[in-house]
């Protein structure tokens, strides 16, 4: 009798055979696929040896043409040649209309307000267009590697929201790809440079692609990246440089800005080519129609300076949000083809005070990092590196006011991992905070597992809500959880370490998960009630404090009685279980105290400015 060989899904029936997995950088302008071969991560070429695949799709009546040929046809067939589709992913028709001047396509609204593009092959959604690009990359990889892929790690901008991330997953599924993980582009870049294996410290990832800009500030501790802050702009990139140069050509040539789609696409291609040549040259000739002109690098710098300045503002904001100084950042990684522009590199170097890392091709660095991650997730690593495949079985979080569980690291998150979240004080003058670390999927503390408690003391006394306490959860490759709390203005800090999985059997984990599903509706309602009760108590205490301080001075008797009546109503309702009634009464009390709050603010400002000269205020 014959024996059937049964392999686990996604795994080879031969335990020592490498599983084929790739990293994909699905970019706005260009896309790449990379894989680890002979221990080295490298981009995979097509049959003609080209590594970069332009993110362009041209639709014919019976087929889709992807890549170089499609991009070359953009000027002659602009309505059927879709480029920069990444800008449309996960967006509604109203969002797309805001990009209308830059996009020559005809749009139709589909279900759920999804935009569809009219082509000779029929209506195409952004997901379908992206799927055609991913399908081309999948076929390239399978041809080059000589086998079927078990999966791919696909990178996305850190700024992508849930809708954009889901659209990317949908496109991959249409292309026949199993998504091992969506990886943020900044993290992929850091992995490509091996910064996860280097010295501990702070790293900035400056990612300026064709259509999106991301800045991320990362802290590396014991091989774990903690994202301190992210920022950026989903509508800023090399495309804007091209439009700026195109606008300059129109002005110099005395042309009308109202060009038809074909001429607009042709002009943008000329502008892009001029920009790229100025990476090495100090001046280039530009021609469009009968017009001939000279574009210098200095002029290009002038044209794109507003866009560079926008990116640097985002950088400063991200550094400020992370609570560090610029001088503390030890490395700056440059990602994206637009970072080849000399002025971009020099401006970033000036801001951070260090030479940016540009050793790896900025067009390839994200795909290379994704390939390294894909190789690990496919199970090709041996020894300690396999710890990367461990996941957190139950969510980790802490207790907030009202006995609520606030999840910081969701279950099934791969370790090692670090996540930070900011919290604040509940009462005026609060100088200490109890951090209660929890594990579980339920909404209320009483239904979760208590892991540890510790106190943060020495918080400067402030009004409720003014203090900022950053709580960081970090799980290392051995599953050891470290929780630290730091008050940002004073720097006071406290921490604890605990083994989250200790003492839990697989059966207990399964039971906790089952309970979270069975009681999901009840838990959601209970959480909503607790949140409104906590907000009611907070508002009552704040109003009472204000009345004690300024009530007699700023309110007449009628106003005082009106506020007191609304407070009594809220106290009564807050003790009950009618969530909607509590919420409505909170609104009524807020409305009746609006004028009182405004008077207090005016009095505070007047007192602060009293006795100061105008020039002192302006300074």
Swiss-Prot record:
What the protein does comes down to:
Chaperone involved in the maturation of iron-sulfur cluster-containing proteins. Has a low intrinsic ATPase activity which is markedly stimulated by HscB.
Q: Which InterPro entries match?
A: ATPase_NBD, Heat_shock_70_CS, HscA_NBD, HSP70_C_sf, HSP70_peptide-bd_sf, Hsp_70_fam, ISC_FeS_clus_asmbl_HscA
Q: Which family does it belong to?
A: Belongs to the heat shock protein 70 family.
Keyword annotations from UniProtKB, A to Z = ATP-binding, Chaperone, Nucleotide-binding
This protein's name: Chaperone protein HscA homolog
One Gene Ontology term from the biological process aspect of the record:
iron-sulfur cluster assembly
Q: Does the keyword S-adenosyl-L-methionine apply?
A: no
**GO molecular function (one):** unfolded protein binding
UniProt key word ATP-binding: yes
PANTHER family recorded for this chain?
Answer: HEAT SHOCK PROTEIN 70KDA
Q: Name one Pfam family in it.
A: HSP70
Highest taxon of source: Bacteria
């Amino acid at each position: 009798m014959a024996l059937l060989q049964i392999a686990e899904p996604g795994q080879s029936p031969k335990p020592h055979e490498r599983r084929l997995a790739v990293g994909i950088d699905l970019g706005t302008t260009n896309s790449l696929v990379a894989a680890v071969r002979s221990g080295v991560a490298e981009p995979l070429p097509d049959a003609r040896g080209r590594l970069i695949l332009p993110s362009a799709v041209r639709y014919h009546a019976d087929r889709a043409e992807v890549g170089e040929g499609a991009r070359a046809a953009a000027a002659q067939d602009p309505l059927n040649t879709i480029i920069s589709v990444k800008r449309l992913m996960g967006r509604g028709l109203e969002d797309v209309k805001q990009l209308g001047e830059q996009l020559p396509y005809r749009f139709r609204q589909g279900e759920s307000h999804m935009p569809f593009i009219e082509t000779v092959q029929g209506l195409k959604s952004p997901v379908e267009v992206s799927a055609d690009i991913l399908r081309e990359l999948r076929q390239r990889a399978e041809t080059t590697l000589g086998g079927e892929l078990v999966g791919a790690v696909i990178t996305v901008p850190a700024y992508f929201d849930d809708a954009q991330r889901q659209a990317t997953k949908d496109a991959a599924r249409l292309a026949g790809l199993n998504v091992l993980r969506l990886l943020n582009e900044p993290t992929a870049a850091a992995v490509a440079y091996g910064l996860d294996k280097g010295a501990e410290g702070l790293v900035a990832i400056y990612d300026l692609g064709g259509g999106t800009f991301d800045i991320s500030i990362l802290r590396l501790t014991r091989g774990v990246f903690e994202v301190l802050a992210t920022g950026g702009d989903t509508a800023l990139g090399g495309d804007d440089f091209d439009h700026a140069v195109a606008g300059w050509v129109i002005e110099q040539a005395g042309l009308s800005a109202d060009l038809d789609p074909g001429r607009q696409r042709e002009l943008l291609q000329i502008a892009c080519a001029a920009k790229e040549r100025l990476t090495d040259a100090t001046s280039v000739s530009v021609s469009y129609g009968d017009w001939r002109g000279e574009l210098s690098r200095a002029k290009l710098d002038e044209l794109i300076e507003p866009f560079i300045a926008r990116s640097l503002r985002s950088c400063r904001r991200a550094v400020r949000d992370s609570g560090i100084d610029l001088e503390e950042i030890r490395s700056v990684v440059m990602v994206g083809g637009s970072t080849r522009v000399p002025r971009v590199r020099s401006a970033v170097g000036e801001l951070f005070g260090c030479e940016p890392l540009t050793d790896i091709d900025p067009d390839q660095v994200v795909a290379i990092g994704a390939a390294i991650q894909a190789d690990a997730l496919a199970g090709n690593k041996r020894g300690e590196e396999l710890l990367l495949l461990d996941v957190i079985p139950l969510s980790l979080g802490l207790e907030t006011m009202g006995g609520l569980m606030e999840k910081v690291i969701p279950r099934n998150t791969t370790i090692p991992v670090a996540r930070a979240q900011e919290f604040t004080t509940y009462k005026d003058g609060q100088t200490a905070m109890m951090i209660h670390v929890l594990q579980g999927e339920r909404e209320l503390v009483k239904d979760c597992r208590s892991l540890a408690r510790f106190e943060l003391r020495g918080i400067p006394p402030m009004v409720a809500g003014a203090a900022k306490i950053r709580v960081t959860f970090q799980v290392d490759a051995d599953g050891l959880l470290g929780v630290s709390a730091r008050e940002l203005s004073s720097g006071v800090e406290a921490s604890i370490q605990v083994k989250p999985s200790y003492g839990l059997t697989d059966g207990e984990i399964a039971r906790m998960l089952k309970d979270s599903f069975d009681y999901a509706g009840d838990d959601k309602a209970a959480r909503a009630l607790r949140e409104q009760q906590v907000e009611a108590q907070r508002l009552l205490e704040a109003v009472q404090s204000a009345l004690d301080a300024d009530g007699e001075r700023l309110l007449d008797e009628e106003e005082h009685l009106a506020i007191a009546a609304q407070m009594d109503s809220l106290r009564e309702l807050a003790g009950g279980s009618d969530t909607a009634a509590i919420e409505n009464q909170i609104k009524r009390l807020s409305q009746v105290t609006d004028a009182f709050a405004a008077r207090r603010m005016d009095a505070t400002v007047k007192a602060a400015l009293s006795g100061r000269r105008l020039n002192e205020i302006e300074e």
